[in-house]
From Swiss-Prot:
GO BP, one annotated term: translation
Subunit structure: Part of the 30S ribosomal subunit. Forms a bridge to the 50S subunit in the 70S ribosome, contacting the 23S rRNA.
Composition bias, Basic and acidic residues: 1-13
Full protein name: Small ribosomal subunit protein uS15
Domain of life of the source: Bacteria
Start and end residues of each stretch annotated as Disordered: 1-24
One term under GO cellular component: cytosolic small ribosomal subunit
Entry keywords, A to Z: Ribonucleoprotein, Ribosomal protein, RNA-binding, rRNA-binding
Free-text function comment from the UniProt entry: One of the primary rRNA binding proteins, it binds directly to 16S rRNA where it helps nucleate assembly of the platform of the 30S subunit by binding and bridging several RNA helices of the 16S rRNA. Forms an intersubunit bridge (bridge B4) with the 23S rRNA of the 50S subunit in the ribosome.
MF (Gene Ontology): rRNA binding; structural constituent of ribosome
Family membership: Belongs to the universal ribosomal protein uS15 family.
């Protein structure tokens, strides 16, 4: 599922270093997390929607790669991101 433009701007302002910061890994991970949460809710009611399931797996995979990149660059930043977004353990 897509997220609204307003919600996307909120996420960018919350996680970005500057107002227009859309490229930093933190912002990208936060936006992907919002989209993943929306699709997860969709999948709870539409269990047999296999096309959406495939899209969800792709988003999770993309987020995983970004998280791996951040963990390799700066482990403390990685821990901050997963703590702030409430993902992982």
């Amino acid at each position: 599922m897509t997220i609204s433009k307003e919600r996307k701007e909120e996420v960018i302002s919350e996680h970005g270093a500057a107002a227009g910061d859309t490229g930093s890994p933190e912002v990208q991970i936060a936006i992907l997390t919002e989209r993943i949460n929306g699709l997860t809710e969709h999948m709870r009611t539409h269990r047999k929607d296999y096309a959406s399931r495939r899209g969800l797996l792709g988003l999770v995979s993309r987020r995983r790669r970004l998280l791996d990149y951040v963990r390799g660059q700066d482990p403390q930043r990685y821990l901050d991101i997963i703590g702030k977004l409430g993902i992982r353990k």
